[in-house]
Amino acid sequence: MKVRNALVSLAAMATLAAAAGCAAPEKESDTTTESGVDAASATSSEDFGGMDELVKAAQDEGELNVIALPPDWANYAEIISTFEDTYDIKVNSDQPDAASQDEINAANDLKGTDRAPDVFDLGQSVALANTDMFAPYKVETFDDIPDEYKDPDGTWVNDYGGYMSIGYDSSVVPDVTSVADLMKPEFKGKVALNGDPTQAGAAFSGVMMAAIANGGSADDIAPGVDFFADLKKAGNFLTVDPDSSTIEQGTTPVVIDWDYLGAAAAANVDTWKTVVPEEAVVAGYYFQAINADAPHPAAARLWQEFLFSDEGQNLWLKGGARPVRGDAMAEAGTIDEELWGALPEVTGEPVIPTDEQTTKAGEYLAANWSKAIR
């Protein structure tokens, strides 16, 4: 799902690509390692005989398939390259700009092949709707992660988070202080939402932010849908999926997205600013999970260990995201204190939708979003 330190401190506020052309090659069905461990059923590094044996098993597989991880999203470029350099395992990154639902679709379409994704990084609504596709696994740092941010068996674990924000090129549009500003004529043809809210976690939270700013709540996302319908009628809403290139080219001068992506945009566009609207502070975490049918099950588990290690968590922090183990690492003295202290404070009461609220909102979006903005 950002308040100066990790979103873990907000826990009390919450209850909580289709295959085309020739068929992909089939993967080997035997996931047993040289030491006799069934990697696909391993639920911890202990099942391999410890981390050293897990590393060996993953290196024997030699590859890891990831999906929907843009290089400039939460520092994934460095995370991937560091994993490759550390373990000498090739990371195959497919569809980097795909949405969460695309990850699930790819896993279903490519099931049984060596091209299927090994791991997922999903928005809340898509993750909770597909838990039967995940393999339970507890990383060595599992106990550091608050109960509110993980499945008890490790079927899914929240990994990093942030706040929904409005990023904008201050050389093109006036300063933004609220969601309502986006309806002004100065924003005509300039406002983009990162993704389709029925498929992408960022877009879902963007509509939730608009709902709260317009009298709705985590229980009532309808005002958010109405806001975007009005934004479209006013000619302000761009039906363009924004990314780093559209921001740099000026195609999408205003983007509703996670605040850590705004920080990444500012690194390339000097005039880019990011604001978290005080009247609609929406926080959210992404969900990390292993594909139960992963073609490289040992590498998938090593990837999880890396992401939730001190090094992996600090790499997300370097990208402006708030790592789920942040508070525990700060207490242990393993957090990057300079980066941790530099996280911007956010004013306002944060809203973290519960699982039930997310499901209800997702159902409403599925029934109403497309007809509202057509």
Where does each model-flagged region fall?
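Extracellular/periplasmic bilobal clamshell ligand-binding domains
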Residues: 332-374
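Sec-dependent bacterial lipoprotein signal peptides
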Residues: 1-20
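Short, polar/charged alpha-helical segment
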Residues: 49-63, 69-90
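Mature extracytoplasmic/periplasmic domains
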Residues: 282, 286, 290-350
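Periplasmic-binding protein-like
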Residues: 148, 161-165, 225-230, 269-294, ...
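Bacterial lipoprotein signal-peptidase II cleavage site
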Residues: 19-33
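A ligand-binding cleft/hinge motif common to bilobed small-molecule-binding domains
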Residues: 125-131, 248, 253-271
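Extracytoplasmic ligand-binding site segments that recognize negatively charged/polar headgroups
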Residues: 65-80, 92-108, 114-251
